[in-house]
Amino acid sequence: MAAEAARAAADASLDGWAPLVADASGCATIGDVMEDGRATAILRWYASHARDLPWRRPDAGPWAILVSEIMLQQTPVSRVLPAYEAWLARWPTPSALAAASPADAVRQWGRLGYPRRAIRLHAAARAITEEHGGRVPDSMSALLALPGVGSYTAAAVASFAFGQRHAVLDTNVRRVLARLMRGHPRAPASPTVMEVRLAESLLPAVPGLAPRWSVAVMELGALVCTADRPRCPDCPVVSACAWHRAGRPADDPALGRRRGQGYEGTDRQCRGRLLAVLRDSGGPVPAARLGAAWPDEDQRARSLASLVADGLAESLPGGRYALPR
């Protein structure tokens, strides 16, 4: 019964979707999607298969959504969940985080990866506290002015936290649209003007429905239309998918090949080792202790310098290092 009610709600809410928009580039538009039922099918699928994630719940406020969006950048949901819950338990509001030190933020971030996000989130919390009275702003311009908030994160927060009509183009959404609408196995390395125009043309005109559409396409890409081994038989729009109809052609050489980035022995691994020593210490760490964490002196010096440049560490007198104060 719940699934049937969700389907009925999805069908009813589609009545006010935008009309056909001509696209000189040849992209399919909302009129094409509605004509063959793809939009309805995706929303029905989402109503029955959406994961219960804390940042999607009705009680998740703008701050929680901002934290989740920053944590989810280049990080799997399974790793984000415990970090997200611990972070909000400690700092449930921007002002609570703003009162803490950058070192506290880095320590709490732990091994989630890409720790500059912790510094930027801390800086954003201070900006929200000092410039917006402790409330996450709801305008795109104000969101974009926050430290560490780019166009994707601003659109996601404006959409999911405030119900606004913005195209939310993450990796999953871009891959679904590339396959479904354009017949390409994947999207280009960076969003193009054509992609943005297509995504915007597909947004529902009904107030409040655009966020549901965006998260439904996002979920489809995360669970079914995955980068590797897509589960096409489980896709609600497989029969209308341009890529599937074309026989699932391989990568277009014009898009350029993506090569997986190694980790072992890289500066990134070195930085992680050194930062772990600083994070786990109760105060400044002598250079000799850092030397035990990474024996290659040149690489260690280069990585330490980059940690300092990124605001993740401070160089102190006597050859000591510490987390930022």
Where are these regions (language model features)?
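Short, positively charged and aromatic/hydrophobic N-terminal segments
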Residues: 29-30
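Short amphipathic alpha-helical interaction segments
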Residues: 294-308
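Intrinsically disordered, low-complexity segments enriched in serine/threonine/proline/glycine
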Residues: 12, 21-22
